[in-house]
Amino acid sequence: MRKVVFFHNNVSRVATDPRDLLSRFHNYLQAAKDYLGNPNLELNLLLGRIDSSIRFDAIKVVRLSRSLLSQYLALRSSLKRPGEQVTLIAGDNHLSLLICLFAKARKTNIRLQISIHTSVNTLLNPSNISGKLKLKFILLSVGFVDNIRVVSDSDLENLRKAITYFDGQIFVAPVPIEIPKAALDRKHSHVLGMVGRLHPERGVAECPAIFEELRVVRPKSEILLIGDGAERAWLEKKLSGFEPRPEFTGSLKQSDIRDRWPQIHVLLSCAPSESYGMALREALVNGVFVVARKNKTTELLQAQFPSVMKVFTNPSEAAIFINSFFEQKFFPDMIIAVRQAIKSEQDKHLIQLAKSWFV
């Protein structure tokens, strides 16, 4: 089996809470152990800027200093055993990838993997200078990369078209979600939720119009917004006259979000494009109806789960679907069917990820 090393020079810049990130890697490792039948498999995480208060007993983690040179030397040290076959996974920022490229250099025993967690279509069509520079760097780097992980079939297709010269492996393995095992008999609520970053690219500007239309037909509906971002202040101002007053929680850890799902009856997503739709799937496995803007990903999800998810093309349509779901109940047998379908899909992707790392 190959040695697997994940390197990120600054996890404080990652949108995911570090505790959730560590938990995610622990789940990856457990899935690999189960699939490969090897309880002795290890993951080696080299992480910079990780808070000293964070503990990690279940997985092997090396804290890195702030010095980029020290980080590079620590990474080289972890790769120095002669003849050892290594899979080196670069964190999803420029510096992490650059340091990994230097560490790999001309070593043929190191397989370098990168992950693209964002929409490939968005990545390939940047709207600002920062995005254009990021795209340029990635396109220059892929010639030195062996594997690329993306999160959806559409991303796989778009990336293959963009880098026809790439002769490595591109595969699909989205971030897995936690699928509850307990039976769920949901209580009816009047809460419409949004979960995710409050950024322009998430279609936040459309939300007030939807909320206004919903308030006309269902004045007692409540709004819960979980997440933070550049548009939060604007959205709070636009919704300041709403009664009941919308609740803004800010960013929450995954464990805290899980505690909130039972409150929410319908999840709204206004994102014009979705790479995988992680929050949409989390809602569905927790018995929450979903109303989402029409795009390639949401259309596929609606086709898979037509009785519990609807896609919209304008605010009026969204409000109609939301109001309709408020009249319905997400029955236990529906939840079981959704969970089974998503788990089957997820297990297939975890096996693919385990193969790319350890085999």
Q: Where do the language-model regions lie?
A:
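A conserved mid-protein helix/loop that constitutes part of the nucleotide-sugar donor-binding site
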Residues: 19-30, 194-213, 230-233
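Membrane-proximal helix-turn-helix segments that form the acceptor-binding/catalytic region
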Residues: 29, 130-148
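Short His-centered aromatic/hydrophobic patch
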Residues: 90-96, 116
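A short, active-site helix/loop in glycosyltransferases that binds the activated sugar's phosphate group
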Residues: 143-169
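Nucleotide-activated donor-binding/catalytic signature segment of Leloir-type glycosyltransferases, i.e.
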Residues: 236-252
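Aromatic "clamp/platform" in nucleotide-sugar-dependent glycosyltransferases that forms part
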Residues: 272
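A charged, aromatic-enriched C-terminal amphipathic alpha-helix characteristic of glycosyltransferases
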Residues: 313-316, 327-359
